[in-house]
Amino acid sequence: MMKNSTYLSICIPAFGRLEYIINTLASIYKDAEDQTIPLADFEVIVSDNDPDKELEKLKELFPYQNFKYFNTDCEGFMNSFYALTYAEGSFLKLHNSQEIFKKGSLKVLLSLVKEHMKDKNVLFFSGGLLKKGKTFTAGSFDEFIQKTSYLSSWSNAFGIWKEDFDSVKDGIDLNKLFPHTSLLFTQNNKRKYIVNDSSLFSTQFVSKRGGHNKFQAFTIEYPSILDKAVIEGDITALTKSKVIRQLMNEFLPSLFFNVKIAQRETYDYVGFKENLKRHFPKGAYCKIVLLSLFAPANIIWRKIRIKFLK
């Protein structure tokens, strides 16, 4: 084993939402206690980019040796990158502040990390959203992106080995909305890609989420990462087309419903119709609006499926 005995770093970028993060941290430490997992096996890092440092009180609430709080001077989603820079474990996993650990999840994460300490295969945690409910393997980066589709953009699924992170962190051109996805796409020459699609976490509902143009993020920024991967030969044009199709048929209708119809979320919508013309097929806007009418049924079914995944 490596000199560093910390296998796993759970890296949580955060800005406010104290009550949610308290629940998340409590679930991690409760799971460790219930499963008798030594605190030395993992560390928990909170990178707080709020200048007011509201989350600094977490140090008093969670006085564990393996808990670390940092106030970070960075903008928006770049905090996902900086959270990783503080980590000292062998494997660095990003974790969304509102995602609560289910019973036994920490053990699953640690087991996978220990299993792949030598081969350093990519480990990806899709949370049951791929409808598999089990662990499966992809033999190439193109196959991996084809199978994970737009979930390759999900920060909570992302993880990277520290030695791989250290080798790319200084020279990488990061997308400011998807820095973790930029990092993921540097891991294009691995022998295997291990996707754990178990439902390991439950999401705390955050009312009226918003704050940025999420429509632009998924019509311009994320597709541009796919474009670059096609140009550099890391994925095929066919794989990119499949991901774009699934964004159009699944993700964007759900987002449109939540923002424009149900108004459960407050993401900026400016430029959506025009932005679709750059990467999406003709008629994409009308199709998304039509499919958004079926979004409630799809959302309910997805929640039921994830809840009962074993």
Language model features by range: what are they?
Residues R17-E33:
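Short, well-formed alpha-helical segments that are part of the catalytic scaffolds
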Residues I100, G104-T137:
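Conserved donor NDP-sugar-binding/catalytic core segment of glycosyltransferases
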Residues N71-A87:
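Glycine-rich, basic loop-to-helix element that forms the pyrophosphate-binding segment
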Residues I45-K57:
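A conserved acidic beta->alpha catalytic loop
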Residues T6-C11, E43:
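Cell-envelope/extracellular polymer assembly enzymes that use nucleotide-activated donors
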Residues T137-A217:
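Conserved nucleotide-sugar donor-binding catalytic segment
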Residues S182-F185, N189, V195-K310:
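C-terminal subregions of glycosyltransferases and related glycan-biosynthesis enzymes
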Residues L92:
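Short aromatic/hydrophobic "clamp" motif used to bind/position activated sugar donors
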